[in-house]
């Protein structure tokens, strides 16, 4: 393996991995299947809202149920596409580039022309009207993506850490003309679901949306001497909070049974 993303395992990362691992065990013991659909709606709403989609959770629910929604056509299409993309989780291999392209084609169907293929022009990560990261030149993208996937296939790193590192490196490369954020978050969920399937039903994206400014700040401050360490710490914190929130939701649902 020739490429290794730069990052450092800090005490904060170690503690968060231990905390999440313990919480996952408890979550399995008390898993509430009735919350799966609600969580999928929260996931779709969160991952799209991060990038400006204005549909409410109620409208996302209506789209899921096939009901008419009064909203911009492209935003409704984004919801339909994201629902289809997350339904592919069981069929995608997190270590295959072709599956990444398939997921992107699903996520961006009917929205842009360049679906399921790497970008041909420049790109960057934008927060509001501010460009916080200029991506590598387009001609480098296939090689950078292949290096990243080779690292993912061969790394011995804990899946919690590996998924966060992949997420950051993916956003750094920004391989597509559009839909990089949505696809990157989907792929982290995919990686985590191969470690613990319950991650398919955890609305991590909804908590990322809650801390949207911090999410983009973590991307912006990563890449220096510490590599993507700040981003890894941030996302692990989001996962830990997601599990805490889910436990509270589970207890409340039991009260109302």
PLM segments and residue spans:
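FIC/Doc superfamily catalytic core
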Residues: 1-255
């Amino acid at each position: 393996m020739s490429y290794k993303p730069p990052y450092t395992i800090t005490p904060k990362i170690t503690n968060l991995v231990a905390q999440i691992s313990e919480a996952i065990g408890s979550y399995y013991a008390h898993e509430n299947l009735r919350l799966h659909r609600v969580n999928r709606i929260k996931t779709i709403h969160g991952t799209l809202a991060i990038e400006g989609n204005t549909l409410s959770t109620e409208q996302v629910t209506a789209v899921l149920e096939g009901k008419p929604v009064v909203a911009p056509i492209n935003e409704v299409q984004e919801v339909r596409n994201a629902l289809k993309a997350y339904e592919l989780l069981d069929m995608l291999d997190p270590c295959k580039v072709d599956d990444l392209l398939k997921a992107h084609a699903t996520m961006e169907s009917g929205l842009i022309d360049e679906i399921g293929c790497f970008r041909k022009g420049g790109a960057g990560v934008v927060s509001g009207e501010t460009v916080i990261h200029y991506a590598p030149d387009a001609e480098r993208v296939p090689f950078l993506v292949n290096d990243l996937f080779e690292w993912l296939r061969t790394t011995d790193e804990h899946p919690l850490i590996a998924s966060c590192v992949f997420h950051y490196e993916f956003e750094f490369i920004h391989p597509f003309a559009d839909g990089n954020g949505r696809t990157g978050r989907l792929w982290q969920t995919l990686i985590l679901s191969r470690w613990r399937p319950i991650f398919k039903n955890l609305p991590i994206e909804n908590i990322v949306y809650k801390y949207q400014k911090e999410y983009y700040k973590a991307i912006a401050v990563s890449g220096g001497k510490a590599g993507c360490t700040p981003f890894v710490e941030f996302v692990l914190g989001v996962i830990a909070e997601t599990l805490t929130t889910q436990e509270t939701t589970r207890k409340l649902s039991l009260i109302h049974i």
